[in-house]
Amino acid sequence: MGTRGPYALVDTTPAKTILVYRNGDQFYVGRKFVFSRRRVANFEALLEQLTEQVEVPFGVRRLYTPTRGHPVLGLDALQTGGKYVAAGRERFKKLDYIHIVPRKPSKMRKLKEIKPVVHCDIKVPSRWQIQSRTSRYINVFTNGRLFIPPIKVIIPKFSLSDWNSVLAMIGEKVFPLGGVRKLFTMDGHLLDDSKNLQDNYFYVAAGLETFKSIPYWKSSWVPSEVQQRFGGNDKYTQTKKRVESKVKEPLQNDSVPPRSQDSVYYAKEKKQMDTELLVQSGAEGDVYKAQTPAKEAQEALEVKEDPEVKVEVPVDQAPAEIVKEIDEIGDSSPGLKSGMHIPASFM
């Protein structure tokens, strides 16, 4: 029969549990570590396992007591349930490690429920709304252009105090001739202040030209309640009748249709000139004679001409004289009968 070898002696030392802190960290709560002689043969093996469990720069190389900082040199110096400080090659940093208490997680604040913004679609005049409204929303037509849709313009609160800035903001989106110089209501009332502006209302922007009376409220972009409000506008109906009456008058007087009158190939009739004299004639029928004599000549007497005064008249204007012939002169003169000598110049 064979003989049995001697039994190997087994270390029956119980395992030890220690709490390890990190050197110089006042917020590190500490970590429990359990080791036995079977797994940890010496002090170097313990330091290697602590390096894996406690994150220390450059690894755990020393253990200190938490109160006075005495170094631990072997496994026998460790006590069950003891507290120690793991450090690298630096010196012990004195802190109150024993009274480090784990912090309770802070309570999460309940976030307020974000409610969606509810936009109000009620269209009422601005004087009924809250004064803290930051802006005005208006719709603007272009003067004389009914078929162009109205432009929505947002006017901030700080711009409402200056009327010129309001017109300038409208002019950035609406482009009448000459820029926006005037703002009218749809029935032609001129606005000169932003206090009269109403939210979600319709206006007409114009330049230097006059307001063109067109039924803007009949546009398809205008709500039905606004169309009903302007449906019986007396001002527009009166102007429409006035324009129609002016168009009918020339058609009744002229037998030629208006298209032929406007045509360049149509020969228009000459107008008869007035036969009345523009200048009235005087008492004697002379248009150049003054009706009343001048003041200087009213008391002057007219001087009559003297009959004995001889006036030299040109030969061509002198009255013609009858010249008698020589025979008649000889018969009538007594000298010729008695044999008087007649000069040779008369022969």
Curated annotation (Swiss-Prot):
InterPro entries to which the protein is assigned, alphabetical = Doublecortin_dom (IPR003533), Doublecortin_dom_sf (IPR036572)
Cite the entry's keywords alphabetically.
Cell projection, Cilium, Cytoplasm, Flagellum, Repeat
Q: Name one GO biological process term.
A: intracellular signal transduction
Q: Positions of the region Disordered?
A: 235-260
Compartments, record wording? Cell projection, Cilium, Flagellum; Cytoplasm
Start-end of Basic and acidic residues biased regions: 241-251
Q: Which Pfam families match?
A: DCX
Which SMART domains does the entry link to?
DCX
Q: Where does the Doublecortin domain start and stop, copy by copy?
A: 16-98, 136-217
* GO cellular component term of the entry, any: sperm flagellum
* UniProt-listed PANTHER family: DOUBLECORTIN DOMAIN CONTAINING 2, DOUBLECORTIN DOMAIN-CONTAINING PROTEIN 2C
Q: What is this protein called?
A: Doublecortin domain-containing protein 2C
Where does this protein come from, organism-wise? Mus musculus
